[in-house]
């Protein structure tokens, strides 16, 4: 029987161990999609205790605690931090087979030097040990300890990027922190947030926005500003993939109606989103950016809890919407104008992997290695099985060797341990193929493939 999470954790063959130790383990991290707060990075935020850094905004953990019967007061409520930590310590032993069990203990090992298993018995001593370490461990220290080279945060076009600019000038911190352009609030015309957001966009743009062409000019201007601060990617939450062709005049009228507070139809929503996303795609192409599409999430399912806690609190799920037809139409509309940017396609529904991977193959080209990417296993799929399946699906239908690799997609500074988790799974999968006689034992080639997926592909793809 193997020991729990020893140095060969998840590495089940000799080739995997060689690949991980020699080629993957020490590669820097390019975290090209996360939700870290740049202000907290700039200020080197410190954490008063392990509860703040672990449970402060982690809806992955919150879902498990609710499932374990923990009362909400110990999750997002007014219980004190130690009580919340004990509630988590009571929950985590029940998470057998869940990646959060592995992530929790990897984080204890890598950042706190703790090999103990977290449970109700060990909780008091782990509370003391972690809090002692946290006195000397700020956000920047965690990032540096994780061997991170580049971080791409997720940012609204109306953001001033104040802290990205400050970080750019900070000579004492050699990690690059770049913004990512996420204009969802300007695309989702059906939501109550749309009109207030357009007003805020006008403020940062410095000009009135009373027409659709002025709105598009403002979006382009903000993208160019983001580019000047180092942005090389956009990100879009496409919960429902739609495509409805329309003329500029049609969409301009829809925009005008929206600003006037008039009720729009579903087809008008679709026409507006299609035209606006297509315009943005052309902007991204001209800037040399990558466009990330996160598809098929079903958000804020629990209305009662949404009204109490708001979004991103653990009440989302996988959607099962049809995406192929509309996605192909959208990508093709850009390709016909030679304006399709580099694109990373993520679906929260794993049934879509083959759909996305085959669609990608229809739009590769331009002399760009892996121009169209099947995004890493995301959110509910970020597990042992989910990561392996995503890599197998990509290998079956494309080139795994051109994969840009793992992202944390996280709000937690400790989540860089997930890169180690991914790298171990990657090396084990490749090792299995080699040891099964499905690929030659050519360490030079194998090592290069591993290092490319862990680091070089992403760095070259985004042009960092």
UniProtKB/Swiss-Prot annotation:
Q: What pathway annotation does it carry? A: Carbohydrate metabolism; pentose and glucuronate interconversion
Task: Please give one Gene Ontology molecular function term for this protein.
Answer: glucuronate isomerase activity
**What InterPro entries does the entry give?**
Metal_Hydrolase, Uronate_isomerase
The UniProt record lists the keyword Chaperone: no
Catalytic reaction equation(s): D-glucuronate = D-fructuronate; aldehydo-D-galacturonate = keto-D-tagaturonate
Query: Which EC numbers does the record give?
Result: 5.3.1.12
- Name the enzyme group at the top EC level: isomerase
Family recorded in the similarity comment? Belongs to the metallo-dependent hydrolases superfamily. Uronate isomerase family.
What NCBIfam families is this protein classified in? Answer: PRK02925.1
* Name this polypeptide is given: Uronate isomerase
What organism is this sequence from?
Caldicellulosiruptor bescii (strain ATCC BAA-1888 / DSM 6725 / KCTC 15123 / Z-1320) (Anaerocellum thermophilum)
Q: Which gene encodes it?
A: uxaC
């Amino acid at each position: 029987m193997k020991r729990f999470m020893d140095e060969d954790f998840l590495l089940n063959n000799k080739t995997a161990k060689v690949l991980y130790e020699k080629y993957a383990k020490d590669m820097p991290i390019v975290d090209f999609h996360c939700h870290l707060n740049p202000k907290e990075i700039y200020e080197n935020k410190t954490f008063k205790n392990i509860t703040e850094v672990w449970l402060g905004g982690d809806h992955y953990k919150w879902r498990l605690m609710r499932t374990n019967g923990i009362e909400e007061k110990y999750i997002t409520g007014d219980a004190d931090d130690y009580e919340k930590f004990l509630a988590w310590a009571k929950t985590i032993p029940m998470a057998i087979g869940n990646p959060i069990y592995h992530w929790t203990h990897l984080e204890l090992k890598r950042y706190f030097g703790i090999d103990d298993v977290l449970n109700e018995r060990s909780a008091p001593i782990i509370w003391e040990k972690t809090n002692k370490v946290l006195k000397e461990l700020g956000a920047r220290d965690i990032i540096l300890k994780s061997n991170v080279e580049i971080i791409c945060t997720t940012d609204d076009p109306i953001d001033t990027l104040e802290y990205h600019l400050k970080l750019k000038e900070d000579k004492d911190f050699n990690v690059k922190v770049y913004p990512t352009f996420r204009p969802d609030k300007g695309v989702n015309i059906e939501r109550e947030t749309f009109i207030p957001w357009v007003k805020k966009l006008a403020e940062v743009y410095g000009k009135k926005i009373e027409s659709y062409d002025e709105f598009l000019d403002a979006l382009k201007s903000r993208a160019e500003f983001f580019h000047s601060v180092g942005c090389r990617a956009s990100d879009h939450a496409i919960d429902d993939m739609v495509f409805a062709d329309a003329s500029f005049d049609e969409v301009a009228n829809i925009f005008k109606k929206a600003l006037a507070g008039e009720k729009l139809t579903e087809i008008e929503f679709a026409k507006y989103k299609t035209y606006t996303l297509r315009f943005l795609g052309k902007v991204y192409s001209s800037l040399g950016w990558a466009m990330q599409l996160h598809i098929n999430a079903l958000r804020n399912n629990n209305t009662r809890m949404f009204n109490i806690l708001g979004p991103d609190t653990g009440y989302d799920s996988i959607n099962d919407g049809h995406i192929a037809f509309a996605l192909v139409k959208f990508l093709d509309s850009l390709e016909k104008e030679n304006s399709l940017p580099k694109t990373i396609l993520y679906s929260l529904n794993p049934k879509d992997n083959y759909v996305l991977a085959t669609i990608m193959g229809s739009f590769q080209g331009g002399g760009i290695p892996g121009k169209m990417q099947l995004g890493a296993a995301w959110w509910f799929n970020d597990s042992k099985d989910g990561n392996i399946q995503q890599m197998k699906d990509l290998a079956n239908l494309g080139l795994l060797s051109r994969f840009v690799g793992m992202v944390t997609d996280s709000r937690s500074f400790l989540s860089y341990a997930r890169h180690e988790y991914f790298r171990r799974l990657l090396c084990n999968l490749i090792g299995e193929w080699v040891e099964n006689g499905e690929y030659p034992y050519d360490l030079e080639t194998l090592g290069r493939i591993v290092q490319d997926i862990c680091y070089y592909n992403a760095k070259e793809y985004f042009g960092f």
